[in-house]
């Protein structure tokens, strides 16, 4: 195995925490015959332990060795893989180097650990090659990655030669991409040890779809039209969804990533205190073959906050052209985002040499940077009842509409007033009562 791994070209720089290189070193020690049996066995168990951990995180099953090799191929963000993401393989000499590496991976797929197991009297490699995973709830592992990697693993098992192996891997790169950006829908921003912002995958995103959002058809239509244009590579605008709380603004944004993920849409959630990191985040993603929505939930600024200046600078752009694969989508309960005071409206007085009306204009100009503004208003009483009845049907609650509406009326009087959120909370309550009564 060590000889095989040492001959890799394109996939030579594997992730620092990979298991392939340590296992190759173990096999080299064994082949040389210069090893301590107990120490070598302990090293093997350490790598198998790591493999089991990875299998648990991603819900791998059956042949964990094959699953891991497939996972390694879709995780390596080398230049070849990145050029293939969302477009597939292009003609070029690099393909010959890729096929050279894939021939090696094909040999790794069929690598025989039996001699090692017999000599050390272990059976861990046999077990991981015919593994039966414990059935887990979806929230316990990343189902999105699990299904895709296991499907690729199965396809690679059936590849007859390096050409078929090449076709399987590059098709995966075309369909989904490579690395964490290819395998995950959404990300948050964290600070890496070096102080630079790092994109961290959100493994369990809310599985909401537009059919779950009752009402607001015009709003959803405008949002979808803008997003479809963006995903298709046409001109599109930054979007601001504003209006009353609990009306489905955030849910509408979340539904977008579930609808357009397979078409290359990715979402990055960012908070106000991270706005100063926006330039560095954009630098990390601007040359990737995906469409990115930078998502800001419940966006608003108080009079003393200046983070909006970072946001304006990013939206307006400086000397560098704003990347066409990035848009900003925000939700807010405020139409103008920034708290406006009567003091800002005073056109006569000056403060530190600046007219206060200029201050007001600077604050209010931020909303104008969003080319698409969509209002989500509080539903009427009739619309509220419709939402309640539709949600009840979706949950399988067989209750009379008149009864539902009467109870929904009582509920909203004590739980924040009329809104889609209030309706959902009411249905959750009824569902909980119904489930309890069945016990």
Predicted features by range, described:
Residues 1-157:
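Intrinsically disordered, low-complexity N-terminal extensions of AAA+/P-loop NTPases
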Residues 133-199:
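Interdomain "pre-motor" coupling segment immediately N-terminal to P-loop NTPase/helicase cores
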Residues 200-228:
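N-terminal pre-Walker A segment at the start of P-loop NTPase domains
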Residues 234-253:
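Walker A/P-loop nucleotide-binding motif
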Residues 258-292, 299-304:
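AAA+/P-loop NTPase substrate/partner-engagement loops
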Residues 302-352:
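Conserved catalytic/switch belt of AAA+ P-loop NTPases
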Residues 349-364, 371-385:
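Conserved AAA+ ATPase "SRH/arginine-finger" region at the nucleotide-binding site
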Residues 373, 377-439:
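C-terminal alpha-helical "lid" subdomain
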